[in-house]
């Protein structure tokens, strides 16, 4: 099939939704389909068979787009709509495949041209307004809710990335359109040598000192201050904390908090690192932690954590428990004392290692690329009645 994909993202950048989009395209390519991707002017070009990247013009000199809703995206999405409309006018497509807010006009274009539409629902956009503190306006939320319902009603199939979104579609009466596809696929990198791990580890922890690792952005919902408060409770010279990621301004803010808590000597920050380096940092960790205190979507990092064979500590909230349980991780209440105790348990209790082994076995069994590709094929079948090549 010839597919027009609409992605209101900087593609490619190593963050949640662009990573997800990359693997959607890869699976479509491996199934024999061609994808024209209309996306923002920012990002690294990626080479995939059958992929053509069509970028909007850089009319506003915008160099950065933050995660979540922003006013910056409004003019960019208008240009995305114009580019998508132009593509529809000059070329025949069998299907429109939209991500996030591009679903608003992707469904409209599909209706006008009489072709199926697939909506890739990475999140509930009305909920994102609250999660990122973008707006508390009831009017704006009502508008977003109506737009979301319009997209769901007029899409032939909807991909949801977690059980929470699947439940939302069921609640709204669109259960038959939903197909759960967790973002469990990640890039494969060359094997890391023990010598490389040892050298990198020496930068952050003396011999015999264990490392508690966090990887991700420093957005408020991630719970970084909460993690630092827990670190302050673990007064053990055998434990260091390593936080990988974060914008420079956010990192500086957390460094000041670490100084205030008098834990700067055992809490280290790397700032943002290349996505290709993340597996190296994961290999350094003795325990991997996700201290989220809000949100409902499953963090992408959880899948990498489970595959690592390292003990995972996470808050006992729906954002995590859609995937995690106490057989494969250490779940803690979203309280400082509970997180500190959970980390200590994961570091020094043999049972935590048993859970980590069980997690890896489950991930190796369940989180496979053939299964991922099969789900994409099923979504095409649902939308088009065959997912045929052309």
Per-segment meaning from a language model:
Residues 326-337, 345-350:
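Conserved acidic donor-binding segment of nucleotide-sugar-dependent glycosyltransferases
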Residues 350-381:
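A charged, aromatic-enriched C-terminal amphipathic alpha-helix characteristic of glycosyltransferases
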Residues 23, 82-89, 104, 108-112, ...:
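Membrane-proximal helix-turn-helix segments that form the acceptor-binding/catalytic region
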Residues 252-277:
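Nucleotide-activated donor-binding/catalytic signature segment of Leloir-type glycosyltransferases, i.e.
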Residues 164, 184:
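Carbohydrate-associated surface elements
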Residues 156, 266, 280-297, 310-311:
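Acidic donor-binding loop of glycosyltransferase active sites
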Residues 215, 240-255, 271:
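Glycosyltransferase donor-sugar binding loop
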Residues 1-45, 226, 234:
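N-terminal subdomain of nucleotide-sugar transferases
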